[in-house]
Amino acid sequence: MIAGMPALTHKQQQDAVERIQELMSEGMSSGQAIALVAAEIRENHTGGNVAMMFDDDDMINDSDDEYHFDDGEEEEEQ
């Protein structure tokens, strides 16, 4: 899948990070803060876009309720 993403300057990226951190410090979850800032950027962005390619396989299991994290360590036997 290819999607057009707003092309941001370093300053715009830094401003977005600071806005996300501000929202999180006010109690908003990181996911909500990122989604809100992304929506604000899309709504207000007047510059160009860059094409981003996403692997369609990444989208297949988005509805899974179970997530796993592999830290590279072997599990201890119980």
Curated annotation (Swiss-Prot):
Region (Disordered): 49-78
Cystine pairs: none
Compositionally skewed regions (Acidic residues) per UniProt: 54-78
Lineage top rank: taxon: Bacteria
HAMAP family cross-referenced by the UniProt entry: UPF0181
Family note: Belongs to the UPF0181 family.
Protein name: UPF0181 protein ECA2377
Organism classification: Bacteria, Pseudomonadati, Pseudomonadota, Gammaproteobacteria, Enterobacterales
